[in-house]
Amino acid sequence: MCAIMGFSTKKLDKSEIPAYFDRTVSRGPDMSRIMDTGSGWLCFHRLAIMGLTEAGMQPFELDGDMVVCNGELYGFRPLKRQLTEKGYEFKSGSDCEIILPLYREYGLSMFAKLDAEFAMIIYDHKTDSLIAARDPIGIRPLFYGYLDDGGIVFASEAKNLIGLCKEVCPFPPGHYYADGKFVRYADLTTVTEYCHDDLETVCRTIRNKLIAGVDKRLDADAPLGFLLSGGLDSSLVCAISALVLGKKIRTFAIGMDKDAIDLKYAREVADYIGADHTEVYMTRQQVLDTLEEVISLLGTYDITTIRASMGMYLCCKAIHEQTDIRVLLTGEISDELFGYKYTDFAPSPEAFQQEAKKRVDELYMYDVLRADRCISANSIEARVPFGDLDFVKYVMSIDPAMKVNTYDMGKYLLRHAFEKDHLLPDDILWRQKAAFSDAVGHSMVDDLKAYAETKYTDAEFEEKRKKYDFAQPFTKESLLYREIFEKYYPGQAPMVKNFWMPNKSWKGCDVNDPSARVLSNYGESGT
């Protein structure tokens, strides 16, 4: 994990760049470098994960070409051996050192060949231009904007570009930029033909592909840790990891000091798999004191993203301050693939599939953004096994009639896939879902709402919300978040498509709060 930045022109002197680039130094506190490309700049803040020596420092160079990459290239060692046989020489153990040889061999078609999560900027000396690309899901962040002289700037986070570019835009996942154009090289969610295997075959494939996705993400030269909420998704990641590694893993859970719903479940999972488990407690005052900091590091005003980030950020902060962990595995992206509580209301399998496509396509603005910022702000790398490209493509291709909840249990396919392994206690494997922001303690969301109520009278709320035409705040809580967002990202609200909400066009989903707690089918999931 690291921070990258690239300038196509020299509108800024080298001495002016740190004022913008160092806003994300937490992403790479180990080493920093700004490289002159001749016509512009490539910048790199490093957090060493693979190839820990100084030889792994970027930008990497090859015959005048240069690259900076924030990413993990899975299965890079066989590729490296193939390239070595072709005569390429390598000086480090870094996975990213193979990028320029791959670019020389395959050109722009290289991006579609990568099994990776990445954001990268390449300087091509032959065309004297920058090429940028982002992984198909957008797990690694990348933004862009234009300078007054027409030059383009790429950066890991939006905050790098505030005050530099008039409009800051998220770089679209699954695209590369070359010759002044954005080109789509990957589409994981458009399915041309569904898989019609029987239930047992589908579940066996889900099992095998998820285990493979976890296994890939356990490869690191730096210490590993695991976020464990006690819910199905993170519990599976932890249990599979413990099985694959064959040793005790370090797990971390957080909850409110009063009513931490998930801590007891996380503890049960940790005990079951024999983990070295740490519990972190947060107070109401900590949540309120940290709110502005969290919104500024997230770069969003979305309600559910901010709520869910409070616990995650404070947990990762404790991990950073109290351990040597450099990599954290998390359970994000399962909901988008297998369904939320609200997708139980999908009127048809086709509607379920379209909703899954929308949610996966927009992940980079919501859950993936949350995981990246909360973890990277604490100088740790996030890895997301449910985002494995092979796994995502397969689950999206499963006949939606099989994925719809006709089983009286959400995410049935995922649960059934691991039923015979006994990797988890049955009461965890078959436990109903609770939203993370609720599961750390119902009182946290209630505290945030109550705090927002104290900030505005009803009249002030109605007056102030009218200032915003795009994604207009609709509660005092959403107005509070928007005002803090505008303080750090003035006029940049279109970076986020809109508020994350259930599909209001579905019966049972016309609600005014993103929390599953307001849905009629929430049941016992949050107890």
Regions found by a protein language model. Name each.
Residues 325-330, 334-352, 362-473:
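Mid-to-C-terminal catalytic subdomains of enzymes
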Residues 98, 209, 213, 269, ...:
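Amphipathic alpha-helical segments that form well-ordered structural scaffolds
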